[in-house]
Amino acid sequence: MALLVGIVVGLVDPLIQPLVDQLTDTKADYSGYGPLLGNLPAAMTLVAGAWLSAAVGEELVFRAFLMHQLHALFALVPGRIYFASLTGGLVFGLMHANQGLSGIVVTGLVGALFGFAYLRSGRNLWSLVLAHGLIDTWGVMTLYLGWY
């Protein structure tokens, strides 16, 4: 499951994000991170903060807590793992509304995948914390280097 998550997440930046940008006729809005361009101390500070607040914090809230609750809520629904994963992904995407429509869609898709992986893996949070941290590290570095 961790390998599948890694492969899919690895495709987000080069394939999925541009496709969603084209389909929504928008681009994810990272304008609030403009000061990172060429600013290594700021980028490294944000990476450290992202590992604590997003990788660990968001995975605890959105996977360990929310997915547990949603899975229980859909207890009588056939295919509840899918409903819980999609609902969790929707909530996760909407929590990233500051990124615009494209950002909501991509983040929601990743959130649904992470929720599904969490439930299917016997609720193993650590591979998702690692994946989330790597995604955020890559994102900060692309902003620092001016690639996005």
Regions found by a protein language model. Give the residues of each.
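Juxtamembrane helix-loop-helix connectors linking adjacent transmembrane helices
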Residues: 1-54, 72-77
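Hydrophobic, membrane-inserted alpha-helices
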Residues: 47, 85-95, 110-114
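Membrane-interface helix caps and helix-loop-helix hairpins in membrane proteins
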Residues: 94-102
